[in-house]
Amino acid sequence: MGIKGLTKFIADAAPNAIKEIKIESLMGRIIAIDASMSLYQFIIAIRDSEQYGNLTNESGETTSHISGLMSRSIRLMENGLKPIYVFDGAPPELKGSELEKRGEKRQKAEELLKKAKEEGNLEEIKKQSGRTVRVTRKQNEEAKKLLTLMGIPIIEAPCEAESQCAFLTKYNLAHATATEDADALVFGTKILIRNLNANATSNQNKNKNNSKRGYILTEINLEQVLKGLNLTMDEFIDFCILCGCDYCDTIKGIGSKTAYNLIKEYNCIEKIIENIDQNKYQVPSNFRFQEARKSFINPNVLPKEDIKIDWNEPQIEELKHFLIKDYNFNELRVTNYINRLLKARKVTTQRRLDNFFTACTKKSTKLIVEETKKEQTLPARKGKKRPTAGDKNKQKAVKRKIEQANANGHHKMKEENKSVDNEKNEDGIKSVDNEKNEDGIKSVDDEKNLDDEKNLDDEKNKDDEKNKDDEKNKDDEKNKDDEKNKDDEKKSLDNFSSNLFDSDKESESGNIIKNEKQNMDDEKINDNLPSLFGDHSRIRHTENKDNISDINNNNNNNNSSSNNNNISNNHFNSVSSNSTFNSSTKLKSEDTLKSNSPLKEDSPNSYNNIKNNNHTININSQINNHKEPISNNNLNNINNSTEIKKKNTLFLLPFCPKDVTNVKKKKYTQRC
C-alpha cells in the first residue's frame, strides 16, 4: 500500500523533486524492480476480454504473469535497461494487522464479484476481479524460473522487496528502484521510478501521428524531496508514519498537511503526542510508531557481501521447452521472443558515457607527493608574519627557560627532572613528557623560523643594494658615453666647417677669407700711415686717390663696352679681365707715387716699399666691382658688404673646387 497521499503531497510541496523522463534516459542503467508488484500488475492487466479471466493453459493454470514478464523484460532490454528482479520474502510481524485487513477486503470483493456475474454487470466484474487478485508462491517460482532461463539476475529478499531494492541503490549496485509503493523512499532509495511497468507495456502514451515518441516515466529524487520539504531523514520518516504506513495505525484527523506542520513545529512524534490536543486528535492505544521507525531505519535486508548479480547467457532450448510444452505457448511466438531477446542483450552491453567519466573524490599518492614537494620548494613570502599574543608568550617562555638553564647549569636541571619524575605517576610522567616535547619542538621551530626569516631579510637587503649599485654604475657609464658622443659630434661639425671655410683650401670660401684678411691688413696700414709720414702722407694719399679716380673714370669711358661683354661672359673670363685692368691701374699709380714721393727708394720706411702692398689692388678690384669714386665712407660700406657676403656664404655656398674647368662633367660632380 505504501504511504497514504505521499506522492501527491510531494508534487505540491516539493515540485522540483518529481520530473517526467523518457525511457531512453535510463539506457545502460541497472534498475531494481519489485517483482511481486510487477506480477500483480500482469495478472490484473492480462485477462480474457469476454469473461475478464486470466490467461490459462490446457490444464487451467494461469499464464498471464509469464507472458507479461517475458514481453516486458525484453522491451526494457531493447531500450538499454538492465533489470534486476527482487522477490518478497516473509512479511514482517508489524505488517500482520495490515495483511488481515487486506484478507477481509478480498473476501468482500469475492462476494461482490459473484453478484456482478449473476447480474451480468461487466463494469462491476472488472472492478471486483482486480481486488480479488493474489500472487501465489507457485506463480513466484514460475517467474523466477523464467527469468533464470532468460539470463536475467534475480534476488530473493529476506523480507520486503522495496527495502532490499532501496539498499541496492545505497550499495551503488542499482541506479533506481521501480515500484508503485512510495514507502521505498522511506527505506532510503535514492531514486524512485513509477509507471515503468505500465508505460513499458502499453501504447497509451504514444501519439498516433508520431509512433516513435518515447515513453514518459515519473522519477522522484529523495535528495530533492528533503531539500524541498526542508526536513531531515529522521523527520521525513516520522512524517510518513503520521501520514499512514503498513506497520502501524494512524492518528485519526491527521493527514499529510497537518502531519507536515506538526513535524516542522515539534520535529518528532514523541513531542507531538505530548503537545497534541487529545480531544481533537485521537491517538490509538496500540500506536507502535517506534517499532515502525526502526523497521524503516534498519530493515531486514541482505548485506552487500551476500548479494550476487550475474548476467548469464539465455538457455534457449530449455526456454522453448518451458514455454511450449509446459504452458502451451505458440511456437512462432516463442521463436519471435527468443530472437528479440538475443538482439536486446547486445544493446544492454553498451555502456554509458557516465561510466567512462567518473568523478574522482580522492587524491592519488602522486599528487600528494608533488604538492608536498612544491610546498617545500616554494620561496618564503616577503615580509614577516605579525606575531600573535600566543607567539609572544611562547617566545618569552623560551627565553626564560634558556636564562634559567644558563644560570643553574645543565646538571641541576637533570637532577630536578629526576626528582620530579620519581614523584609523579606513570600517567603524569607521560603527560608531562608530551607537553615538554611539544613545547620544546614548538620553541625550537619558532626560533628556527625567526632565524630563517632574519637571514632571508638580510640576503634580500644585500641583493637590493647590489642591484642599486649596478644600476647606478650603468647610468654613469651611459652618461659618459653620451657626453663622449656629443663631443665627437661637435668636433666633427667643427672639422667639417673648417674644411669648408679654410683659407688654405682652394675654394671660393677660402678666397673670400683671404680677401677679408687682406682688407683687415689694409685697414691697419691706413691707420699706421699718419704715424709713419705725418700730414704729407695724407696729402700724397689723397692725391693718389684722385689719380686713381681719374684713371678709373678714363677706363670706365674707354672700356665700358669691354666690361659689359665681360659681364655677359662666364665668371672665369670676368676674373681674367679684372686682373688685366688691375695691372694697368697698378702701373699708373706707381708712377704717380714715384714722382711725388720725396723719400728715397732704398729707405726701409719709404712709400715705395709700402706701395707694393695689396692695398692698391684691393681698392682697384673694389672700384671695378662698384664703379663709384671711393671715399672713407664707401670703404666702410664695402667692408660691411663683404661681411654680409661672408655670412651668406656660410649658409649658401657649397664646397666645390677652385678650377671647375678641369673637372669632367658627370651626373654627380660632387655632393655637398
From Swiss-Prot:
Q: What's one GO BP annotation on this UniProt entry?
A: DNA replication, removal of RNA primer
User: According to the UniProt entry, which residue ranges have a biased composition of type Basic and acidic residues?
Assistant: 413-493, 502-526, 535-548, 587-603
Query: Cofactor: bound how, per the entry note?
Result: Binds 2 magnesium ions per subunit. They probably participate in the reaction catalyzed by the enzyme. May bind an additional third magnesium ion after substrate binding.
The PTM entry states:
Phosphorylated. Phosphorylation upon DNA damage induces relocalization to the nuclear plasma.
Compositional bias segments (type: Low complexity) = 549-584
Instruction: Show the PROSITE patterns listed in the entry.
Output: XPG_1 (PS00841)
Task: State its location(s).
Answer: Nucleus, Nucleolus; Nucleus, Nucleoplasm; Mitochondrion
EC identifiers of the protein: 3.1.-.-
Provide the binding site for Mg(2+) 2.
D181, D183, D246
Family membership, please give it: Belongs to the XPG/RAD2 endonuclease family. FEN1 subfamily.
Protein name per UniProt: Flap endonuclease 1
State the encoding gene.
Answer: FEN1
